[in-house]
A protein has these predicted regions:
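S-adenosyl-L-methionine
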Residues: 166-198
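Conserved SAM-binding loop of SAM-dependent methyltransferases across substrates and taxa
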Residues: 135-146
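Short alpha-helix immediately C-terminal to the canonical SAM-binding loop
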Residues: 160-161
Length: 215
């Protein structure tokens, strides 16, 4: 933890200001920097601002989504994927302490994605590009599902730092600021465009993020 935290604190000085940002994104970036510089990464998921933006926890509708997962034919897979860990000190779901509302929600989204087309095979998805990757939960779930998958997140530099911490602490191997690895975190729009053109086939994930893009 301390080694990763030290690396992130160093990288937090490299503020990325090229791409335009909405005021909400600016506030989020400032809050993340506060968390990093005050050595609170170990419990960043208890930060109220981070929860408001990234984390769904004790909401009743999550219970119904969990029930739907349990009734699904793929429940043996979902059961493994919803297991929560202690990275970031997440709030556990009050009706299932082995998971969190946010992780249940992310897995539920994957299930609905599968339901949208019978031709989709999760095991055959090799490349994913996610726009706005939260704190890295969806990426972690897909890596857990398939450790050979190529996963690239485009987000703000400061959010990339949060993602790097979360994924690194989950024993993933994220690359910060480049696309040389299997799990890449980038914040340069030009870099994203070049990378996307190289990948002929990929799964594109954007959970609300496209609507937040500055025009």
């Amino acid at each position: 933890h301390q080694r990763i935290e030290k690396f992130i604190k160093k990288k937090s000085n490299e503020i990325y200001k090229i791409n335009p940002r909405l005021s909400t994104h600016k506030n989020l970036a400032e809050e993340i920097l506060k968390i990093i510089k005050s050595d609170n990464l170990i419990k960043f998921l208890r930060n109220s601002f981070i929860q408001k933006i990234f984390f769904i926890h004790n909401r009743l509708f999550i219970y119904y989504e969990l029930l739907e997962l349990k009734k699904d034919i793929n429940w043996p897979i979902w059961k493994k994927l919803i297991l929560e860990n202690d990275v970031g000190t997440p709030v556990r779901f009050f009706l299932n302490s082995s998971s969190s509302g946010n992780r249940i929600r992310q897995v539920y989204i994957i299930k609905k994605f599968l339901n949208s087309s019978k031709s989709i095979n999760l095991n055959k998805i090799q490349n994913i590009i996610e726009i706005g990757g939260g704190y890295g939960c969806m990426a972690d779930i897909f890596c857990k599902l398939n450790n050979k998958i190529s996963y690239t997140i485009y987000d703000m530099h400061e959010v990339n730092l949060l993602q790097f911490y979360f994924l690194k602490m989950n024993n993933r191997k994220p690359k910060l600021g480049n696309v040389s690895g299997k799990l890449n975190l980038i914040s340069d729009l030009n870099q994203l465009n070049k990378f996307a053109k190289r990948k002929k086939n990929y799964c594109f994930i954007a959970n609300w993020s496209i609507s937040e893009f500055p025009i």
